[in-house]
From Swiss-Prot:
The gene is leuD. Catalyzes the isomerization between 2-isopropylmalate and 3-isopropylmalate, via the formation of 2-isopropylmaleate. Pathway: Amino-acid biosynthesis; L-leucine biosynthesis; L-leucine from 3-methyl-2-oxobutanoate: step 2/4. Pfam families: Aconitase_C (PF00694). Its EC number is 4.2.1.33. It is an enzyme of class 4 (lyase). It catalyses: (2R,3S)-3-isopropylmalate = (2S)-2-isopropylmalate. Belongs to the LeuD family. LeuD type 1 subfamily. This is 3-isopropylmalate dehydratase small subunit. Heterodimer of LeuC and LeuD.
């Protein structure tokens, strides 16, 4: 069972690039592992680190004021490119629980949900307002009421009912299927006889 997602409070990191693909999120050389953990240190690897593996001081996630952020605000078409579940694993392992973008690649969006992260689609103006808040400001994301709250603003969002319920209850596909166990058994009995 996944951890239910009702509300999340955290700080914001901003990476407003458009078309960030899964290879930029987690480069292919790190995909040999099958565990879901340990990928956070490779998140945005080619941007976060210089050739000598020192942190790139100009990369937003390396800003000391943004370290430990759990909400990522980004551009359009986030998670495009090849389908790899390692990308949401890397984001989650780094500590992100919420990704706010102008849009997501479909498979990436579903993989976020399947891994207990909340991907939120918001327009550019709203994302820019969120991106402009002072570092270390706590932002609250309330999935139940579909609202993002700062000390000065409230921003409403919407999410498909099925995904919302799944996250609120912390259900994975097997647990959802098991809710229909009696119907499945009933069907199997009809088919067998």
């Amino acid at each position: 069972m996944m951890e239910p997602f009702r509300t999340h409070k955290g700080t914001v990191a901003v990476l407003m690039n458009d078309n960030i693909d899964t290879d930029q999120i987690i480069p292919k050389q790190y995909l040999k592992r099958i565990e879901r953990t340990g990928f956070g240190k490779f998140l945005f690897d080619e941007w976060r680190y210089e050739e000598d593996r020192k942190e790139n001081p100009h990369f937003p996630l390396n800003d000391p004021e943004r370290k430990g952020a759990s909400i990522l605000i980004t551009g359009e078409n986030f998670g495009c490119g090849s389908s790899r579940e390692h990308a949401p694993w890397a984001l989650a392992d780094y500590g992100f629980r919420v990704i706010i973008a102008g849009g997501f690649a479909d498979i990436f969006y579903m993989n976020c949900m399947k891994n207990g992260m909340l991907p939120i689609v918001m327009d550019k103006e709203t994302r820019e307002k969120l991106a402009a808040i002072e570092a270390r400001t706590i932002v609250e994301v309330d999935l139940e009421n579909e609202v993002i709250m700062t000390t000065q603003h409230q921003f409403h969002f919407s999410i498909e009912k099925m995904w919302r319920e799944k996250l609120l209850k912390g259900l994975d596909e097997i647990e959802i299927t098991m809710q229909y166990e009696e119907y499945i058994q009933e069907y199997e009995e009809k088919v067998v006889h």
